[in-house]
């Protein structure tokens, strides 16, 4: 996918939103979602979509699962018929999220990022990592659907994407493209994938966002994080300085990408 040109779309992508893993999970607690932040972000995304889609103020949940937040199946069919989000096929939104406290533990102890699927521990860790990150993806999709956003989870591994160590290697964007053109909001996540050089690796949400921005050519790319903006070093560093202005050049972009705190 890295070598391909812009993917032809019948409808343009308006925005790619990257949800930082540190913004939607508690990174210091194993597999713990920050429910408050996730709810706030889901609400803000719905409100942003409403500005361009004339969505009604009343939110109609698309989460019909039996759980503590929504124990009853819908009975008002007209509520869905009158919801522009379910009629609008021009939403043009793609969401990518980091793993946060999901997947990192499993990937770290098994060294999935170093490859070597011939090793039993690496293969076991690959499976465990995917179970963890897809669990988070499911919960984020659930939260978005609760706000009436027609979101669908897309896993890089299931889409056939591969890595080239830290970058996307081969990958077919047709599934994502078809989802967008059908009026859905794809929700993609960092994932354990097969690697062209070392057998397997971790494909981060940041690498996915960068590649999708290149191939889909959106109007905007928005990063939602747990910090105030872009710093000259990891924000956890006491000497970190918030950058008020950024001069755009290719050299600086790549340098900034590798300095960026992994979310």
Question: What does each model-found stretch correspond to?
Answer:
Residues 65-92, 106-193:
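Ligand-binding beta-strand-loop-alpha-helix segment within the catalytic cores
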Residues 38, 45, 141, 176, ...:
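Generic hydrophobic/aromatic pocket-lining and core-packing "Φ" positions
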Residues 91-103:
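A structural preference for short, pocket-lining loop segments at secondary-structure junctions
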Residues 104-122, 158-185, 190-263:
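Active-site phosphate/oxyanion-binding loops
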Residues 43-54, 141-150, 181-185, 218, ...:
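Generic secondary-structure signature for well-ordered alpha-helical cores
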């Amino acid at each position: 996918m890295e070598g391909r040109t812009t993917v032809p779309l019948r409808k343009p992508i308006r925005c790619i939103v990257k949800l930082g893993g540190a913004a939607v999970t508690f990174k210091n607690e194993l597999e713990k979602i920050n429910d408050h932040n996730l709810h706030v972000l889901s609400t803000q995304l719905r409100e942003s979509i409403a500005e361009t889609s004339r969505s009604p103020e009343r939110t109609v949940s698309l989460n019909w699962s039996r759980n503590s937040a929504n124990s009853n199946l819908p009975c008002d069919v007209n509520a869905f018929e009158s919801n522009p989000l379910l009629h609008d096929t021009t939403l043009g939104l793609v969401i990518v999220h980091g793993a946060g406290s999901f997947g990192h533990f499993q990937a770290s102890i098994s060294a999935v990022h170093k490859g070597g699927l011939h090793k039993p521990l690496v293969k076991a860790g690959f499976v465990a990592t995917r179970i963890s990150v897809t669990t988070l993806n499911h919960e984020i999709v659930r939260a978005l659907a609760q706000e009436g956003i027609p979101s669908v989870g897309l896993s890089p591994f299931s889409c056939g994407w591969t890595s080239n160590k830290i970058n996307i290697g081969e990958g077919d964007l047709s599934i994502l493209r078809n989802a967008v053109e059908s009026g859905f909001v794809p929700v993609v996540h960092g994932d354990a994938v097969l690697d062209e050089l070392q057998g397997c690796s971790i494909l981060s949400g940041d690498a996915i966002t960068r590649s999708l921005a290149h191939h889909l050519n959106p109007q905007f790319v928005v990063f939602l994080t747990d910090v105030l903006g872009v710093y000259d070093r990891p924000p956890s560093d006491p000497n970190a300085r918030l950058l008020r202005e950024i001069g755009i050049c290719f050299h600086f972009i790549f340098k900034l990408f590798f300095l960026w705190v992994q979310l």
